[in-house]
């Protein structure tokens, strides 16, 4: 595991898992939200992403569908946090300030995005693919590393 992509609903713990894996595996964690950072243009974001993808190793969390093909083609591991809506809402409750704008997205995530996420798994045939369905499974996975 040297190039890891983590996807899933808001509140599922993508960033938390990325940080934990980064510490355990001593790999750099690249947040797509961090690459976007404020008012970057699309071209600036794309340039930052290309530089990040060219690194020897990384962990990237975030969905950003427009960039998924580039990330999937270069990853060796894809982790899908396939949590139910209540687990994701619980994750949102940990954030300050509370992201009210994410509640509707979380509530409808599975219906709107599950098929897309399954397609990402299918596209990543070359990679190790993990589907973790609960925080307990995430903890158990981290304990195996």
Language-model segments: residues:
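NTP-dependent small-molecule kinase module
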Residues: 24, 114-145
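Hydrophobic positions on the alpha1 helix immediately C-terminal to the Walker A/P-loop
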Residues: 17
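A glycine- and Lys/Arg-enriched "phosphate-lid" helix/loop adjacent to the NTP-binding pocket
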Residues: 83-119, 136
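Hydrophobic anchor at the beta1->P-loop junction of P-loop NTPases
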Residues: 6
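Conserved nucleotide-sensing/catalytic segment adjacent to the nucleotide-binding pocket
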Residues: 28-83
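Conserved lysine of the Walker
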Residues: 14
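Walker A (P-loop) ATP-phosphate-binding motif of ABC ATPase nucleotide-binding domains
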Residues: 3
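The conserved Walker
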Residues: 10
